[in-house]
Regions:
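Mobile cap/lid helix-loop segments that border enzyme active or cofactor-binding sites
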Residues: 1-49, 69-73, 166-178
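A ubiquitous short alpha-helical element
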Residues: 14-22, 88-93, 103-108
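Short alpha-helical scaffolding segments that buttress acidic/His motifs in well-ordered protein cores
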Residues: 34, 50-55, 85-89, 101-109, ...
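Conserved alpha-helical segments that form or flank metal/cofactor-binding pockets of metalloenzymes
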Residues: 52-82
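Carboxylate-rich helix-loop segments that flank metal/cofactor sites and access channels
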Residues: 77-94
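Alpha-helical transmembrane segments and membrane-interface helix-loop junctions
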Residues: 94, 119, 156-159, 163-175
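Charged, amphipathic alpha-helical coiled-coil/dimerization segments
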Residues: 113-121
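Transmembrane-helix boundary/entry motifs in multi-pass membrane transporters
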Residues: 128-129
Length: 178
């Protein structure tokens, strides 16, 4: 559990939303911005999800590792691929686009100034210019909010990953009387 004093009224929310509930005005703006990467589809949602999860792995961010985006799941991303993610360098089941983006994402997290021209060119070749801009912006979100979760000790999702990832809107069932 986070060390922050979380409002009791948020007990039914996932850990990330509970922490962000301390500043609801920021949460709405952030969620709207972060969701654009998944809805605009300038980058394949499977590639985005693999990179989001790899960033979280590298930073040791428990919450981001415990959730999955519905877009990536709908696009066919399976848990077996996610389980292989920490060893992607040594595996042949990651395609050229995924490999270029994962290489770039790792370097972004570890030392952004160390991204080589060749690594950037591989991403531009795979995603195009607009896709590359969207990808780098998404990496900034993934990196920043993975670090946010680490700093505030946001725990993993209680349901083992069935929740949506940060940026996806909550689908709440209609309540009786409303």
């Amino acid at each position: 559990m986070s060390w922050l004093p979380l409002p009791a009224a948020t007990a039914d929310r996932d850990p990330f939303e509970r922490v962000f509930a301390l500043r609801p005005n920021l949460f709405e703006a952030w969620r709207d911005f972060a969701s654009l990467f998944w809805t605009r589809r300038l980058v394949d949602p499977v590639v985005l999800e693999l990179c989001r999860l790899r960033v979280a792995q590298l930073l040791g961010a428990r919450y981001p590792q415990s959730v999955r985006t519905s877009q990536a799941q709908s696009a066919g991303l399976k848990e077996a691929r996610i389980a292989a993610l920490s060893d992607w360098w040594n595996r042949g089941d990651f395609d050229a686009t995924e490999r270029a983006c994962l290489r770039f994402a790792e370097q972004f997290v570890l030392d952004a100034k160390g991204i080589s021209d060749a690594d950037a060119a591989a991403v531009v070749s795979a995603l195009g210019e607009a896709g590359t801009v969207a990808f780098v912006e998404a990496l900034a979100i993934f990196d920043g909010f993975s670090r946010f979760c680490c700093s505030l000790d946001v725990e993993q999702a209680a349901d083992g990953g069935a929740q949506r990832a940060a940026g996806e809107r909550r689908r709440t069932p209609a309540r009786s009387g409303q």
